Design a protein with these regions (language model features):
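Non-cytosolic juxtamembrane linkers/loops
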Residues: 2-6, 219-280, 446-457, 462-467, ...
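A generic fold-level signal
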Residues: 28, 241, 323, 346-348, ...
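Membrane-embedded alpha-helical bundles of multi-pass enzymes
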Residues: 1-234, 450, 464, 476, ...
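Short, conserved active-site loops that position catalytic residues or coordinate cofactors/metal ions
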Residues: 26-41, 85-86, 250-251, 283-303, ...
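Membrane-interface helix/helix-cap signal primarily in integral membrane proteins
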Residues: 340, 361-364, 370-377, 429, ...
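Soluble catalytic regions of membrane-associated enzymes that act on cell-envelope
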Residues: 229-373, 407-410, 416, 420-422
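CN hydrolase (nitrilase-like) catalytic-core segments centered on the catalytic cysteine
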Residues: 133-134, 286, 294, 306-330, ...
Length: 552
């Protein structure tokens, strides 16, 4: 019982350390240094959970190993649920059950992950910690792909405030930073006593001597990363060929929670803030409004005029834009008449960014990667009840766009990932490869009413700038409206939860990065190596059983 209580306490401590490392309600910018040891209790418990010896005689045979894997799964379930309940309390703002659903999903994922982590030290008793390191980074990569991709909680994002350290993301992506930060936890978890006791013995201290090469390599990699970050920072400062002046508008009111009269008032706020920004900086190159800042469908109501009140609002907006000499990038519901799966002509809605100059729509980007369940659910026929339940919660479903639009505004070329899209490296990479000189993120996190939620989102955007060596600006409904330099440094930020405009001037560096060239190759490489070592270990284990003539 004592062992169980100690292990449970360690798992709960690990979950708390994990959540505290990221921006959270107590520490809005997180405790990034804690991340370097936050997982140590977790890896320690995994080693202690049942047998770790491949000797069938010592482990109690196959039954002992299965029991160890089962116990590890239970600890994983506890860790997954607790860690993500603490990390994402703001999800309950979407729906009372959203946070619970996400935590239960992580419960299942972590239960499986812990089985593989336990298997690593069963198959490789001395060097299993290195395989655990590979497995965890692989897991972080895999959880970003597919319909359920959810990048919140990836270890490397805790370091967003350290430009010198995260410079290696221009080569390895976020995966290089995660690997660097994760290693001390894995190493310490292997060094701690893994039997019933909790005090160090001579055997545990010998671990540091035996595994000194791995520690030396990590220390060398850490030092090299800092040196590279410093060199790259100096290089980028001298490599910019020009600048862009941008006005970022923050209206501080969720546009989807307002009626028609409030929408009209909000239009007045947006136009007033824009006029003030242009008055302060007359030579501004671009004005940016946040995601769906203006709700009435601009193209639709200009074309079909089926709602007099909405058309009047759109006309008021276009009258304002007609006298502006500066192009505006506006977040809007872009509705089009298309043939749907039913074979009928119907209105289809896209979450979009419209580039408008003198009341003319110059170009449109339609959000490619939609938020699962909240914006998109492609399994209507497979799960009709769930689909209807989502609709009943007043969910706004969109059709995903396909084009990787690069906008042209005078001498500037830029792209505009919308909200959730700046959480994924491949999207900004695609834009950069298509010729974008800088990235503009339009976002709305006002629904959460949480500063820590907004800062968590910001922390991921920082890496998109570093990965592609491109400046990135964010126009957010309620915060964090800001400009991020190509090194990941925050150049300017508007105060959150205020109606304001932020005028920024950003550098426009040229060239590309290794990450822009090969993308998430290193995340894939971690996964491939982890799979190969696991398969090799299982093969050797089975061969050993055959040689000893024992049964599982």
């Amino acid at each position: 019982m004592k062992v169980f209580l100690v292990n449970t306490a360690a798992i709960l401590a690990g979950a708390l350390f994990f959540a505290a490392s990221f921006p959270n309600p107590l520490f809005n910018y997180g405790l990034p240094l804690l991340a370097w040891v936050a997982y140590a209790p977790v890896f320690w418990v995994i080693r202690r959970a049942g047998s770790t010896d491949t000797s069938l005689k010592k482990s109690g045979g196959g039954k002992g190993i299965i029991a160890a894997l089962a116990v590890s799964a239970l600890y994983g379930a506890l860790y997954g649920y607790t860690a993500y309940r603490l990390l994402t309390p703001w999800l309950d703002s979407v729906h009372p059950l959203a946070g619970t659903f996400a935590s239960v999903f992580q419960l299942a994922v972590m239960a499986v992950l812990f089985v593989f982590l336990k298997l690593a030290v069963i198959l490789y008793p001395r060097k299993g910690y290195l395989l655990q390191w590979l497995i965890w980074v692989s897991y972080e990569y895999l959880r970003t792909i597919g319909f359920l991709g959810f990048p919140y909680g990836i270890t490397g994002y805790t370091q967003w405030q350290y430009p010198l350290l995260i410079g290696i993301a221009s080569i390895f992506g976020i995966w290089g930073v995660s690997a660097l930060v994760l290693f001390p936890s894995v190493y310490l978890g292997a060094a701690f006593p893994n039997k019933n006791g909790v005090s160090f013995s001579k055997k545990n201290l010998l671990f540091f001597y035996r595994e000194r090469l791995a520690l030396a390599i990590w220390l060398g990699a850490l030092g090299a990363s800092l040196v590279f970050g410093a060199i790259q920072s100096n290089y980028i400062e001298g490599a910019s060929t020009g600048t862009a002046k941008i006005a970022l508008i923050q209206q501080n009111a969720d546009p989807w929670k307002n009626d028609a009269s409030e929408t009209r008032r909000m239009l007045g706020v947006l136009t007033s803030l824009s006029s003030k920004a242009l008055e302060d900086e007359p030579d501004t190159d671009l004005v940016v409004w946040p995601e769906t800042a203006f709700v009435p469908r601009i193209y639709w109501h200009l074309t079909y005029r089926d709602n007099a009140e909405s058309y009047a609002l759109v006309k008021e907006l276009m009258d304002f834009l007609a006298v502006q000499t500066v192009p505006f990038l506006i977040g809007n519901d872009d509705a089009r008449l298309e043939v749907t799966a039913s074979g009928k002509w119907e209105r289809v809605d896209y979450n979009a960014a419209l580039l408008i100059k003198r009341a003319e729509i110059m170009d449109v980007y339609r959000k490619n990667h939609l938020v699962p369940f909240a914006e998109h659910f492609p399994y209507e026929k497979t799960f009709p009840r769930l689909y209807q339940a989502l609709l009943d919660t007043d969910t706004q479903f969109w059709k995903p766009g396909r084009e990787k639009t690069v906008f042209a505004a005078g001498h500037l070329r830029f792209s505009a990932p919308i909200c959730f899209e700046d959480c994924f490296g491949y999207i900004s990479r695609d834009f950069t490869r298509n010729g974008a000189q800088f990235i503009v993120n339009l976002t709305n996190d006002a629904w959460a009413g949480s500063l820590s939620c907004q800062v968590q989102h910001l922390s991921m955007a920082v890496f998109r700038a570093v990965e592609n060596r491109r400046s990135l600006v964010r126009a957010a409904v309620s915060g964090q409206t800001c400009a991020i330099g190509p090194t990941g440094k925050i150049l300017a930020m508007a105060p959150p939860f205020t109606e304001t405009a932020l005028n920024v001037e950003i550098p426009l560096p040229t060239g590309s990065t290794p990450y822009s060239y090969w993308g998430d190759f290193w995340g894939i490489l971690f996964a491939v190596f982890a799979a190969m070592l696991l398969l090799n270990g299982v093969f050797r284990f089975i061969l050993r059983i055959i040689q000893t003539g024992r049964e599982l």
